């Protein structure tokens, strides 16, 4: 069964319940959340996340395998500022606790940026950080995201991800989140040779590590190393390639999460595309009028 959803908001007083209700309104059967704003460390207490009501709503609406995304401010690749590294380690630990309490089993993490020290140095620091963070008894996996290679990002190649995983002691607690936009922007040919890319991933990392898919089109040509998401079918990857990935036999049990942009000219009144994009991917039929339909909802 196709497991598809999108990024949704967990906020206000209803928190997890609000996230599940939003996902349900999109026709989704999974979703991804941040536990708070992705650009800061302000977080509600676990008892204020409205977990019981949220889980009950999920069960009633056939929603499962939800995913948490760690905030961008975590950078455990940073060797130049010890405070940034320590904050990353501490905050990632507390995010794993929240992820576990919510009932999610995957927390997606951008591996980090080496901020000029070089990829090798950054990767060693990421390994050090993950070894500090991981509790051998935790029931959550940290899903390292495939990155576009923007700036000094680590994790642009499958080899870099494999190097991180191999360096971590309790690496049974590590998985991978494959982002279609990032992988395309990093230079992999997901458009005309996705099977080749997947085989390469399997050889280098292992397909059994693949636990989350971010399904995004890209505003950029392959190899641009920019990381700018586009609506499904309206970018450089295109609908056919993305729907092939979404319905791929080897990936059928993996949650697929859309992180495509809201639509509209008015910055204050953009509309979420997810109900329309999910339906279009389920139907396997590209709709050229989609962006207009999203605006008119």
From Swiss-Prot:
| Enzyme Commission number(s) | 3.1.21.2
Detail which positions bind Zn(2+) 3.
Answer: 182, 227, 229
Sequence positions that bind Zn(2+) 2: 145, 179, 214, 259
Name the SMART domains on file. AP2Ec
Q: Which residues bind Zn(2+) 1?
A: 69, 110, 145
**What would be an example GO MF term here?**
DNA-(apurinic or apyrimidinic site) endonuclease activity
Q: How is the cofactor bound?
A: Binds 3 Zn(2+) ions.
Tell me which PROSITE patterns the record gives: AP_NUCLEASE_F2_1, AP_NUCLEASE_F2_2, AP_NUCLEASE_F2_3, AP_NUCLEASE_F2_4
For this protein, the record's CDD domains field holds:
AP2Ec (cd00019)
Function of this protein?
Endonuclease IV plays a role in DNA repair. It cleaves phosphodiester bonds at apurinic or apyrimidinic (AP) sites, generating a 3'-hydroxyl group and a 5'-terminal sugar phosphate.
Name it: Probable endonuclease 4
